[in-house]
Curated annotation (Swiss-Prot):
Coiled coil: none annotated. This is Small ribosomal subunit protein bS18c. Residues 1-19 have a biased composition (Basic residues). Belongs to the bacterial ribosomal protein bS18 family. Part of the 30S ribosomal subunit. Residues 1-23 are annotated as: Disordered. It holds the Pfam family Ribosomal_S18. Gene3D superfamilies: Ribosomal protein S18 (4.10.640.10). Keywords: Chloroplast, Plastid, Ribonucleoprotein, Ribosomal protein, RNA-binding, rRNA-binding. InterPro entries: Ribosomal_bS18 (IPR001648), Ribosomal_bS18_CS (IPR018275), Ribosomal_bS18_sf (IPR036870). One of its GO terms (biological process) is translation. It is found in: Plastid, Chloroplast.
Length: 101
Protein backbone atom coordinates (compact mmCIF):
# COMPACT_ATOMS: atom_id res chain seq x y z
CA UNK A 1 0.00 0.00 0.00
CA UNK A 2 1.28 3.45 -0.77
CA UNK A 3 1.66 6.07 1.94
CA UNK A 4 -1.33 8.18 0.90
CA UNK A 5 -3.73 5.31 1.63
CA UNK A 6 -2.02 4.42 4.92
CA UNK A 7 -2.72 7.88 6.35
CA UNK A 8 -6.48 7.53 5.94
CA UNK A 9 -6.68 4.00 7.21
CA UNK A 10 -8.22 3.78 10.67
CA UNK A 11 -6.48 1.79 13.32
CA UNK A 12 -8.48 -0.96 14.96
CA UNK A 13 -8.93 -0.19 18.62
CA UNK A 14 -9.39 -3.03 21.01
CA UNK A 15 -12.35 -2.82 23.34
CA UNK A 16 -13.30 -4.65 26.48
CA UNK A 17 -16.57 -6.50 26.11
CA UNK A 18 -18.95 -5.65 28.92
CA UNK A 19 -20.52 -8.45 30.86
CA UNK A 20 -24.28 -8.71 30.54
CA UNK A 21 -26.10 -7.40 33.63
CA UNK A 22 -28.27 -10.53 33.81
CA UNK A 23 -26.49 -13.85 33.70
CA UNK A 24 -27.94 -17.00 32.20
CA UNK A 25 -28.56 -18.45 35.69
CA UNK A 26 -30.42 -15.39 37.00
CA UNK A 27 -34.17 -15.87 37.03
CA UNK A 28 -36.23 -12.72 36.47
CA UNK A 29 -38.95 -12.99 39.09
CA UNK A 30 -40.75 -10.61 41.43
CA UNK A 31 -39.34 -12.53 44.44
CA UNK A 32 -35.72 -12.05 43.34
CA UNK A 33 -35.23 -8.71 45.11
CA UNK A 34 -31.44 -8.64 44.75
CA UNK A 35 -31.80 -8.74 40.97
CA UNK A 36 -34.75 -6.34 40.76
CA UNK A 37 -33.14 -3.70 42.98
CA UNK A 38 -30.25 -3.29 40.52
CA UNK A 39 -32.65 -1.90 37.90
CA UNK A 40 -34.35 0.71 40.09
CA UNK A 41 -33.06 4.25 40.62
CA UNK A 42 -32.57 5.86 44.03
CA UNK A 43 -35.95 7.54 43.63
CA UNK A 44 -37.67 4.21 42.98
CA UNK A 45 -38.05 4.62 39.22
CA UNK A 46 -37.44 1.82 36.73
CA UNK A 47 -34.22 2.55 34.84
CA UNK A 48 -34.34 2.67 31.05
CA UNK A 49 -33.15 -0.10 28.81
CA UNK A 50 -30.26 2.00 27.54
CA UNK A 51 -28.98 2.56 31.08
CA UNK A 52 -29.47 -1.09 32.07
CA UNK A 53 -27.92 -2.46 28.85
CA UNK A 54 -30.65 -5.11 28.62
CA UNK A 55 -32.34 -6.70 25.66
CA UNK A 56 -35.93 -5.78 24.87
CA UNK A 57 -37.26 -9.05 26.25
CA UNK A 58 -35.21 -8.78 29.46
CA UNK A 59 -36.33 -5.19 30.03
CA UNK A 60 -39.97 -6.19 29.57
CA UNK A 61 -39.60 -9.06 32.07
CA UNK A 62 -37.80 -6.80 34.59
CA UNK A 63 -40.54 -4.16 34.28
CA UNK A 64 -43.29 -6.73 34.86
CA UNK A 65 -41.42 -8.20 37.84
CA UNK A 66 -40.94 -4.74 39.41
CA UNK A 67 -44.62 -3.90 38.94
CA UNK A 68 -45.68 -7.22 40.49
CA UNK A 69 -43.36 -6.65 43.46
CA UNK A 70 -44.82 -3.17 43.95
CA UNK A 71 -48.40 -4.49 43.89
CA UNK A 72 -47.54 -7.23 46.41
CA UNK A 73 -45.89 -4.60 48.67
CA UNK A 74 -42.47 -6.19 48.60
CA UNK A 75 -41.15 -3.06 46.87
CA UNK A 76 -42.30 0.52 47.49
CA UNK A 77 -43.85 2.57 44.69
CA UNK A 78 -41.80 5.60 45.76
CA UNK A 79 -38.64 5.96 47.75
CA UNK A 80 -39.68 8.50 50.39
CA UNK A 81 -36.41 8.61 52.30
CA UNK A 82 -35.47 12.16 53.14
CA UNK A 83 -32.35 13.03 51.24
CA UNK A 84 -32.03 16.54 52.57
CA UNK A 85 -32.27 16.98 56.30
CA UNK A 86 -33.06 20.39 57.69
CA UNK A 87 -30.30 22.06 59.56
CA UNK A 88 -30.88 24.30 62.54
CA UNK A 89 -33.18 27.13 61.60
CA UNK A 90 -32.36 30.73 62.43
CA UNK A 91 -34.87 32.18 64.91
CA UNK A 92 -37.07 34.85 63.35
CA UNK A 93 -37.91 38.08 65.14
CA UNK A 94 -41.48 38.01 66.41
CA UNK A 95 -41.90 41.75 66.97
CA UNK A 96 -43.72 44.19 64.67
CA UNK A 97 -42.26 44.54 61.21
CA UNK A 98 -40.83 47.80 60.01
CA UNK A 99 -40.90 48.80 56.37
CA UNK A 100 -37.83 50.34 54.82
CA UNK A 101 -38.67 52.92 52.16
Amino acid sequence: MDKSKQLFRKSKRSFRRRLPPIGSGDRIDYRNMSLISRFISEQGKILSRRVNRLTLKQQRLITIAIKQARILSSLPFLNNEKQFERTESIPRPTGPRSRNK
